[in-house]
Amino acid sequence: CRRQVQRFLRRKALGIKYASKLDIRHAYENTKAGVIMGILKKEIPAAKWLLLLVEALLNMSPRGCLIIGGYLDAWLFNLVMSYVLRYMLSLEKVRRGTRQRLVVALVAYADDVAIMGRRLADLRSAARTAAKWTLKTFGLTFKPGGDEVAFLSIEEEHRRRHLTRPAARGCPGLDIVGFVIRRTYTTVRRAIFRRARRQYLRAGREVDKSGTVPLFRAYKLASYYGYFTQTNSRKCSTTLRTEKIKPLACQVIGWATRQKERIHNNEKCKHYAGPPAACRCL
């Protein structure tokens, strides 16, 4: 998703100048089983046994909707969203006898959708039309007041990045999936960066004091590490010593995993009936 947005913004032929971020209200809770079964019966009418299986699984939901965290539920919601995304891309306007798409490009992650185009008015029109169609077809509503971004040109971003005052160097960007994406660089979302920085600073003090980090922090360090490698955060990574601390965290996780497997294989574990990965002894 992040890389796709970067490619769209850097392709001059698309002429993208604006972006709007949309979010579906209570997406999984409002996606009903009847809507999903209607789509599946339309797409695969001959797969009767598969339809019965999916319907039986959906009936296990207490409210008759999708459940957050379910593997099948995630794919079924993506199926519903594919119809919404294709409808957005199909919206057009006619100017001087030629058809022009309102949405030039879009990306989606779960219930977050980012639409990009040449005019902000086109994006607003597409959002209103798609919201009405989605509510009528699937019973899903978009949250009002989505974020709107006006991207700067590559030259303007380079000029701002070399200003004297650090506070004036910022550029507007699209905030999606934990990243803030511009044309020439990408940063981490402020709230995520604050939590990641806090964990690496604490880990640095623990490494200086005892030479290792506790297991619970090792998991956090490993999960936050990708935000630094996938963004323009080289100087910050050097300051936080991520390249030194992250391998140490992986060693701690590996040691804990081997200990768990050893206890499990020696039948000293009360959860022995399950797989080693599900063992909760440590």
Regions found by a protein language model. Give the residues of each.
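Arginine/glycine-rich "motif VI" loop of SF2 helicases in the C-terminal RecA-like domain
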Residues: 139
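Conserved polymerase palm-domain catalytic core
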Residues: 3-110, 114-135, 171
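Right-hand nucleic-acid polymerase module
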Residues: 9, 22, 86, 93-97, ...
